[in-house]
Amino acid sequence: MEFSVKSGSPEKQRSACIVVGVYEPRRLSGIAEQLDKISEGYISNLLRRGDLEGKPGQMLLLHHVPNVLSERVLLVGCGKERELDERQYKQIITKTISTLNETGSMEAVCFLTELHVKGRDTYWKVRQAIESTQNSLYSFDALKTRKGETRRPLRKMVFNVPTRRELTIGERAIEHGTAVSAGMHLCRDVANMPPNICNPAYLASQARQMAEVYENLNVTTIGEEQMAKLGMNSYLAVGRASANESIMTVMEYQGAVDSTEKPIVLVGKGLTFDSGGISLKPGEAMDEMKYDMGGAAGVIGTMKALCEMKLPINVIGILAGCENMPAGNAYRPGDILTTMSGQTVEVLNTDAEGRLVLCDVLTYVERFDPELVIDTATLTGACVIALGKHASGLFSSHNPLAHEMLNAGEQSGDRAWRMPLWDEYQDMLDSPFADMTNLGGRPAGSITAACFLSRFTKKYNWAHLDVAGTAWNSGANKGSTGRPVPILSQFLINRAGVEISE
């Protein structure tokens, strides 16, 4: 899909279709009023006749509107003007793209980016329009022998901005929107891949392919032999029973002018399949445990977006690839593991494995002397119970970092909700035999998991993003969502100091 921005009057646009908004009840937007005036009341007459009420998502396609150069005009219902918010705006964009594809339009000029969305500027509206467009067009059919065909698919979208001085910010929004969309696309592709294909080695291969494309990206891998030398016994224990080798992939992006600038480190849990191990999961929906590498998919997707945007910062992405399987040599409930940090962990449940992988990685990244570390993981079902499918769980003992992350979530629409990380919860991890257990019990499960991780992050500022509820959808629309690529990408944009306001 090709995107561009321009500033101009709707009646002068030569395009297969121009898209304008209509408010409820039957009220023309400013741009629609211009078209109505040029067409001598053609549009308002249709509305008076009851052809379109203006309710959110209603569509009316007009052909050969008098005195308008475009072949078609698509009227889009936007609801009540004062109630047009972020969620409704994105839904309207998605419905518009679907309608344009159904009509066979190959190009369109969209004036919906000129609508007033509460608290949002041109940059946000253009960028969200691009991301919503690309998300709506995504499909995963790589393994289907019969692929569906879209009739004359939409190939070019032009977003109109109110004034010429906003063209630069619109172009920046396109740059960021297309980059984040590319990252989300990669995240979804990798996460949707079945576990017989997507194993830790596959994750590593995807990272290496990126390094061949982007010259400032370097990729190295650490296998089980090297992990053993490093003392990553906890990580190794989780993958011991799998026929697929555990592989930690390290992606180093050098974008800062000063190569010695401290890096931001992103760590992604990469359980390419989680059977639960000896503490075997129920069979129902176990197929979805291929998404237990959603954190790693989010990190590789964010690294893709970062490389596309060429941000002037140093970032290291870690894909903690592993597979948790049952076998005669699997680790067991009751085992006590000595982590890379030297701390010991009593295993109470082998299905609480993500934290056992992450704790060693969080110790490993100390060698980079990081500016900060953010780990992202499909860590706990408890987070899904607490927050559902809309907000990721954010944990951090560093208030400034937590506020930055929350702000990035609000900006990107990939929102997070801060959860407590109080010392009182730490007691729930007490063990009579080791320094801690890997399970704090049923109450506050997402919090005690974060408390566990916090014990391995004392040497840097750290945040933990639990995306168990947001990384994928179940049911009829089963598949990866592409999250948390938007929030992580926005965080990096902000950290890079890129100007995005008008």
UniProtKB/Swiss-Prot annotation:
Its main location: cytoplasm. Keywords: Aminopeptidase, Cytoplasm, Hydrolase, Manganese, Metal-binding, Protease. Pfam families: Peptidase_M17, Peptidase_M17_N. Gene3D superfamilies: Leucine Aminopeptidase, subunit E, domain 1, Zn peptidases. It is an enzyme of class 3 (hydrolase). Its EC number is 3.4.11.1, 3.4.11.10. Binds 2 manganese ions per subunit. It is found in: Cytoplasm. Mn(2+) 2 binds at K269, D274, D292, E353. Its cofactor is Mn(2+). InterPro entries: Leucine_aapep/pepB (IPR011356), Macro_dom-like (IPR043472), Peptidase_M17_C (IPR000819), Peptidase_M17_leu_NH2_pept (IPR023042), Peptidase_M17_N (IPR008283). It comes from the Bacteria. Mn(2+) 1 binds at D274, D351, E353. The active site is at K281, R355. One of its GO terms (biological process) is proteolysis. One of its GO terms (cellular component) is cytoplasm. GO terms for molecular function: manganese ion binding; metalloaminopeptidase activity. It catalyses: Release of an N-terminal amino acid, Xaa-|-Yaa-, in which Xaa is preferably Leu, but may be other amino acids including Pro although not Arg or Lys, and Yaa may be Pro. Amino acid amides and methyl esters are also readily hydrolyzed, but rates on arylamides are exceedingly low; Release of an N-terminal amino acid, preferentially leucine, but not glutamic or aspartic acids. Belongs to the peptidase M17 family. HAMAP family: Cytosol_peptidase_M17. Presumably involved in the processing and regular turnover of intracellular proteins. Catalyzes the removal of unsubstituted N-terminal amino acids from various peptides. PANTHER family: CYTOSOL AMINOPEPTIDASE, LEUCINE AMINOPEPTIDASE-RELATED. This is Probable cytosol aminopeptidase. It comes from Shewanella frigidimarina (strain NCIMB 400). The gene is pepA.
